[in-house]
């Protein structure tokens, strides 16, 4: 069984302005297949909070259907997410609820998909300590791709992978976190959460405290960080 520690917090600018957190995260740790999602509602859109929350739920909805088949592709999962997101929005216009979407999803048939639309980070640390960062795609003009903003399937960055093996860990983060992380320290971040934070009572609350007290001067953005890992010993952390 995999384990998860995750938290989303408002950034100082939203605290100051009395606005809600526009990030969202979700994880399902299942004995056969797991999913992890983080989303960042675009701050320029009036319903971005609803958009990011709907995207996490849509990813879960899509995953539950997609994992039933041993032959579903990464493209199939993404198409399901796109449709499910619009259904989850109900009467909210998609362009008012634009959000990034980063997904790790296992199908229970020996495969996993990494999928990313927009900025943020998906990184995987192997049991040997190696770290691989999933490549994001940009439009080249400093704008981020997002659900609810003009994009195509080709704007998603996605790849098939093996599911998490014992000792592996996955890090998903919105840009409020990822932009301040040093690539060479991603493995250390995962180790800190797994070996230190996860052993404390209320690990999610402890992580939220760390995110609110982010050690970068003048940080402003909402922050979401999710770490999912598969212990080497099922009875250990």
What spans do the regions from the language model cover?
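Short glycine- and acidic-rich boundary segments immediately preceding or forming the N-terminal edge
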Residues: 1-24, 28, 78-87, 94, ...
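N-terminal entry segment of metal-dependent catalytic domains or homologous docking segments
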Residues: 1-61, 120, 153, 157-161, ...
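Acidic loop->beta-strand submotif enriched in PP2C/PPM serine/threonine phosphatases
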Residues: 18-31, 94-107, 113, 138-182
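Generic enzyme active-site microenvironment
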Residues: 38, 117, 173
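Short, charged, surface-exposed loops that flank catalytic or proteolytic processing sites
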Residues: 66-78, 195-203
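Catalytic core of PPM/PP2C metal-dependent serine/threonine phosphatase domains
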Residues: 69-125, 155-162, 217, 228
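C-terminal catalytic subdomain
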Residues: 88, 152-237
